[in-house]
Amino acid sequence: VGKSSLVNKLGGGKKAKVEDRPGVTLTKQWVTTNIGIELLDMPGVLWPKFDDRTTGENLAFTGAIRDAILDTEELAAKLCGKLYTIAQADFCTRYKLDPSSLEGLSDYDLLCAVAKKRGFLLSGGELNTERAAGIVLDEFREAKIGRITLELPPKKESTKPSEGDNA
């Protein structure tokens, strides 16, 4: 749920513009609720550069970074690789792929396997990986592949006392 959706829910109507993509809210907008509370809807802020490449990739996978400024084939290929690693069963089930036939394939080859299985071909029999990329990204964002977590919280250190401790 985005900020504008929350403002609309609390404000009791559709006062702030909402779309299923980032960057819709361009200016500040005050919304008054039915009980007189004023809420301020504002554009989001995204760091121009991330300390960790994985953070940027994960944001792009989810659509938090506009596809228009990205190479979607490269992005979808990386997503295929990540899904094959962290959610192999969901990935293979969605695209009807045999996991044993995918062992050792590059990220791009995994995207090609999706294109081939879905029958995405250009004239001359060349795989339409651009179309496959769009499908993989859309289906991941719509949770059609499954409800998959890209990041896990850091492991909590054990608070169990060790054998020599007096508790």
Ranges and model annotations:
Residues 14-167:
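Helix-rich effector regions associated with P-loop NTPase G domains
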